[in-house]
Amino acid sequence: MGSEMCIRDRYIPAGIFKIRLPFIHYRWEISECLQAILMCATCLGAIPILEQILGVPYEIAWSMVIINGLLYNLHSLLGDPVVPGWITPAVPLVSAFLTQSQQGPERVKALIALQLVVGLIFLIMGISGMAGKIIGLIPNAIKAGILLGAGFSAIMGEFQDGGRFGKYPITVGIGALLAYFMLFSLLFRKMKDNSKLWHVIGNFGMLPAIIIAVIIGPVSGELPAPNLVLGSIIKVPEIGQIIHTLSPFSIGFPTLSTFISVIPTAIAVYIIAFGDFVSSEELIREADQVRQDEKVDFNANRSNIISAIRNLIEGLVCPYVVLSGPLWAAVTAAVSERYKEGRESMDSLFGGIGTFRWMTFICVALVPVASFVQPILPAALSLTLIVQGYVCCKIGLGMIKTDMERGIAGVMAAILAIKGASWGLLIGIVVYILLNGSFKNPATTAESSEEKA
């Protein structure tokens, strides 16, 4: 009993937060440490997005990734039992919205406004506790349309003229097929069930596909060979240059009209991000049922508030195109699976989560690591978006049950992918009300009827 109480009480209470420090409140997990060394390449994949959308040089983009990596640790530090990440499905929508502005201060201010509004939505939902109720009121056809639109945008962006598939067809093509096979194939799922080796490899998610890209890119001549720089070890973020170039305290705050213009996109982003809270709660619930020696407390309000803090800080210091989301589902699932094997495998869930995020922060700041993966970052980003497109379409299609919902979601998704979130949301809502007669969510209405009965 004493051991159980010890692991349950390893934190410093601070209101809704439960502060946990590495080595004091949880042990360093070697497995997650090694996984983080390899998976930090995905975090560095934000660099080409920042270079392309914001027009910042590589060194500035790299510095922004390091700052973002530090902020990831707020989740394990403040008691949120998940591995956080980008709001990945929203990346195509955000990129499409930002490219409507001219590159330079105007586009940066649009991103500042968007990230601050997204942060405020997270904060309001976290403080009020209304997230679940509000999202539940939105019809599934509209939510599906947003996800399908994000999926269409991701795939269209990679395969359109000038897209990364056209630049690196062999690398991206083979890497994407391998990623699809390892992440979604029924055959590979059977291979994992029958082989511990394939099971371990499968737990690394997209990493094997990225490693293949590192090999295929230079061999095919599409990408330069990795260049391992050993002269210096640690990259010190160029905070002064970031603030001078990107911070609203230097370039000025967005106008009121800019803040108003980002609201539809911000709403779409939050609707997408809300799915992460649902996924987080389910992953943690499953782990908590298996492990009775540690009470894992997932609080969606706390997760909303921490995500708000990250977005607000970045919006004021280094606006980040991929935004700050509450969950990296693939890694959280992998950590959770090892945690469920018992205390011998992982003492505390926070040990796996904290170790992974602290180690990815350290690794993205290591010059040899960043220099080695730099040449293949565009291809790695392309693989991420192509996989995300599949996931968005799969989840979106799974949400809709009737022919009317399918039609509305499809029309809305196409408009959203071509014209942006503002047009997509507007047309989706108008068509839904026109065909359905109201904006009520049939699922919510059915649940209310059952409760009354």
What residue spans do the PLM features occupy?
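Helix-loop-helix hairpins and the membrane-proximal interhelical loops
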Residues: 8-58, 194-198, 202-298, 448-453
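Helix-loop-helix junctions within the multi-pass membrane cores of secondary transporters/permeases
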Residues: 15-28, 35-47, 78-147, 290-389
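Helix-coil boundary and interhelical linker segments in multi-pass alpha-helical membrane proteins
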Residues: 48-62, 98-110, 159-163, 259
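Membrane-interfacial loop-to-helix junctions in multi-pass transporters
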Residues: 58-66, 142-144, 256-260, 295-305, ...
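Membrane-embedded alpha-helical modules
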Residues: 107-224, 350-453
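Hydrophobic alpha-helical segments of integral membrane proteins
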Residues: 130-138, 155-162, 232-256, 309-312
